[in-house]
Structures are given as structure tokens and as C-alpha cells.
């Protein structure tokens, strides 16, 4: 099964995880980048990122190469913002024809909200369930054995080995 990891990363936790999963699965990587970058300041990232996520904004993305027909499985990766998916992911989903694909997702969070974010992702995709889900707490900035075990278990999911 040919897979691609489509992700957005602000501070590197999601990118770190995407690369770990890609190495284990042999998946391709597609990093989404908005034309106008989000701020990374301690307060401003929460204010602007949270507002953007809660308002379901769809920012313009920098050009990327993607052919949906080349993949059976799409794995979405994102940081959790205000219990929501990140706006660049929403833009991608609404811009691409993803019908007939298997979907999985991983979310990186500092506190809580990934469960609600996964529900919003399923709604955005128009599906009832994801083939695999993974929630990590700051995997790059606070590495630990539990996160590594969760990544391995996620990659061992039958949906990736059909």
C-alpha cells in the first residue's frame, strides 16, 4: 500500500513525527506551508493559531506537488490548535479530490484536545472513522520511550500493511 504523510508543523514536533513514521513505513512526505506564516512567539502563536483554527480559516498554501491517484493511504499529521485541526490541513482537504482513500492521522499536542481534533478531521473528510490514530505529547521537545512505542504501534497498524 503506497502512503503519503501530509502534515503541517509549526515548531517541529509534527515534522519530527512525520519523518519517524515515514522512515518506518516507507511513506512519502508532503509538508504544507501557508503563504503567510503563523507567528511562533509564545503568546502570539496561541492567539493567531487558535483563532485561525476556531474560525475554520483556509489559508493559501505555497505550491506543492501531489497526485492523489499515486496513493492508497493518506496520513495526516498536525499540531492541535484549540482542539482543532490546523487551517493549512483544512485548505489541503478542501482543495484535493481524496475520495476512495484510506485515512489515518497523528496529532501532537502540549495539553489536550486531539480527540476533538480527530472528530473535526473526520467531519472535514466526510468519514466515520480513521484507519489509525496516534496522539503524542511534544515528541520532539520532550522525547520519551512512551512516544516511541506509540509511533511503533501506529506503524504496525494493519491498515498500512495490506
Model-found features: residue ranges?
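A generic structural motif
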Residues: 31-34, 106-107, 132-138
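Glycine-rich phosphate/pyrophosphate-binding loop and the adjoining helix
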Residues: 129-162
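Structural beta-sheet core signal
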Residues: 5, 76, 104-107, 132
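Short, aromatic/basic amphipathic alpha-helical patches
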Residues: 116-125
Amino acid at each position: 500500500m503506497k502512503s503519503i504523510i501530509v502534515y503541517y508543523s509549526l515548531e517541529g514536533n509534527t515534522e519530527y513525527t512525520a519523518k519517524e513514521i515515514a522512515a518506518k513505513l516507507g511513506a512519502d512526505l508532503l509538508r504544507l506551508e501557508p503563504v503567510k506564516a503563523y507567528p511562533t512567539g509564545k503568546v502570539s502563536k496561541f492567539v493567531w493559531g487558535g483563532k485561525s483554527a476556531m474560525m475554520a480559516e483556509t489559508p493559501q498554501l505555497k505550491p506543492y506537488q501531489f497526485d492523489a491517484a499515486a496513493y492508497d493511504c493518506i496520513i495526516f499529521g498536525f499540531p492541535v490548535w484549540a482542539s482543532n485541526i490546523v487551517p493549512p490541513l483544512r485548505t489541503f482537504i478542501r482543495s484535493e479530490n481524496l475520495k476512495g482513500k484510506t485515512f489515518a492521522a497523528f496529532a501532537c499536542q502540549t495539553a489536550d484536545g486531539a480527540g476533538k481534533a480527530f472528530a473535526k478531521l473526520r467531519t472535514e473528510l466526510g468519514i466515520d472513522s480513521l484507519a489509525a490514530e496516534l496522539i503524542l505529547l511534544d515528541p520532539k521537545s520532550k522525547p520519551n520511550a512512551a512516544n516511541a512505542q506509540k509511533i511503533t504501534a501506529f506503524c504496525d497498524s494493519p491498515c498500512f500493511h495490506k
